[in-house]
Amino acid sequence: MLTLLKNLECYAPEHIGKNDILICAGKIYKIAPRMDNAGCGLIESADDCDGLLAFPGLIDQHVHIAGGGGEQGFSSRTSEMDATDILAAGVTTVVGLLGADGTTRSLESLYAKAKALEEQGLTTYIY
């Protein structure tokens, strides 16, 4: 499936002006000014995005995706990160790591959480 987003103010990360973005299989395939979808039966949707901005996703290199804390005991633990909250901050790639709580959190649970976030559209690494 091809989707064409037209007339976006694009940053990559510097401002590159008004461009169209062609998306193929959920990934950005091409960014260029004034792409024409006439005569191309492969584009399923073309949306006018005039007035909207497009930025590259941010990378957060230190995230306790499986939760953190625990230095003062079990009541001081924080909950797992949610993909919605991560994406709302403009972050599309996270590097997950364990916190101080080595009793209830493990590399296995960190790996499982990273895979769950990938299923929700994020790119993840663990350390």
Predicted feature locations:
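Short, low-complexity, polar/charged sequence segments that are solvent-exposed and flexible
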Residues: 23-29, 77-80, 113-116
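Metal-associated gating/positioning segment near the N- to mid-region
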Residues: 49-112
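Histidine-rich, glycine-flanked metal-binding segment
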Residues: 1-3, 10-55
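A short, hydrophobic/aromatic-rich structural module that often spans a beta strand
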Residues: 11, 110-118
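Metal-coordinating catalytic core of metallo-dependent amide/deamination hydrolases
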Residues: 116-127
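Short secondary-structure capping/turn segments at boundaries of alpha-helices and beta-strands
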Residues: 8-11, 82
